[in-house]
């Protein structure tokens, strides 16, 4: 499960690098993955790899 958000299941996107002459070369846009620890209802801790965007959303909802 490399380079995937474990909550939203988002993965890397593909696109192009563009030079000044507008030459296109393939590249990959990776997520900003961070490791967080969440507590389950039973009090058990689990570690997840989530993107910074998901982490921000969880903080907004009061989960982190």
Swiss-Prot record:
Residues 1-23 are annotated as: Disordered. One of its GO terms (molecular function) is structural constituent of ribosome. GO terms for biological process: translation. Belongs to the bacterial ribosomal protein bL28 family. One of its GO terms (cellular component) is ribonucleoprotein complex. It comes from the Bacteria. This is Large ribosomal subunit protein bL28. Disulfide bonds: none annotated. Keywords: Ribonucleoprotein, Ribosomal protein. PANTHER family: 50S RIBOSOMAL PROTEIN L28, LARGE RIBOSOMAL SUBUNIT PROTEIN BL28A.
């Amino acid at each position: 499960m490399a380079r995937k958000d474990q909550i939203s299941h988002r993965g890397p996107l593909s696109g192009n690098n563009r030079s000044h002459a507008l030459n296109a070369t393939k590249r990959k846009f990776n997520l900003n993955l961070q490791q967080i620890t969440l507590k389950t209802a039973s009090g058990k801790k689990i570690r997840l790899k989530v993107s910074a965007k998901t982490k921000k959303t969880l903080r907004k909802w009061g989960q982190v």
